[in-house]
Regions:
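Short helix-initiation/N-cap motifs at beta->coil->alpha
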Residues: 2-11, 99-126
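Pocket-flanking alpha-helical
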Residues: 6-37, 59, 141-145
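Extracytoplasmic/secreted proteins, especially bacterial periplasmic and envelope-associated proteins
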Residues: 8, 12, 17, 27, ...
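Alpha-to-beta junction loops
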Residues: 14-24, 68, 112-115, 129-136
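Solvent-exposed coil/turn segments that connect beta secondary-structure elements
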Residues: 25-27, 48, 56-59, 75, ...
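Ligand-binding "clamshell"
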Residues: 31-43, 58, 130, 135, ...
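A conserved helix-loop-strand patch within extracytoplasmic ligand-binding domains
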Residues: 43-92
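Conserved small/polar residues in nucleotide/adenosyl-binding loops
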Residues: 164-170
Length: 173
């Protein structure tokens, strides 16, 4: 079964309708459990799906100019990952301690005065022709026809916290 959002896959596992799902990283799982009062647990990492910065109207990060726009996912943990990747590449600086809960409100320095365009994760790739750059989750990058190794201008390293996980409800263990 394919879902087009991040909520329903966890709801069907929590309800017992499905035994497991496979799409998320630990920060999202933890946030989901806290916000929804669910009892899902990580059953182990499967593979690495890095976030990447991909070309929009610009083909290189060397072309970054004052006022450029960058589209990012707007859900809490994925927006934070996108912002951390932008910070790792010298585009913005976040407040100390912002971490995996960072939002645009945590941007402390913006030397290029970039406009951060916040969109639902599944919409980000669709604005590539309208924004200077896009920052995509690995799954949406693949779905949009991007290759991390061939198309990403920058991407998360394998020691990032962003591994995809299989989850199970606690009552099935």
């Amino acid at each position: 079964t394919v879902f087009d959002d991040y909520v329903r896959p966890n709801e069907v596992v929590e309800s017992g309708e499905f035994d497991a799902n496979y799409f998320q990283h630990i920060p999202y799982l933890d946030q989901f459990n806290e916000e929804k009062g669910t009892h899902l647990v990580n059953a182990g990492g499967i593979h690495y799906e890095p976030f990447g910065i991909y070309p929009g109207t610009k083909d290189s990060l060397d072309d970054l100019e004052d006022g450029d726009s960058i589209a990012v996912p707007n859900d809490t943990t994925n927006e934070a990952r996108a912002l951390l990747l932008l910070q790792d590449n010298g585009i913005i600086k976040l407040k100390d301690g912002a971490g995996l809960e960072a939002t645009v409100n945590d941007i402390e320095e913006n030397p290029y005065n970039v406009e951060i365009v916040e969109l639902a994760a599944e919409q980000v790739a669709r604005v590539a022709e309208e924004t200077s750059y896009i920052v995509l989750n690995g799954n949406y990058a693949l779905q949009a026809g991007y290759s991390v190794s061939k198309d990403a201008l920058a991407y998360e390293t394998s020691d990032s916290v962003s591994y995809t996980h299989l989850t199970l409800p606690t009552n099935s263990l």
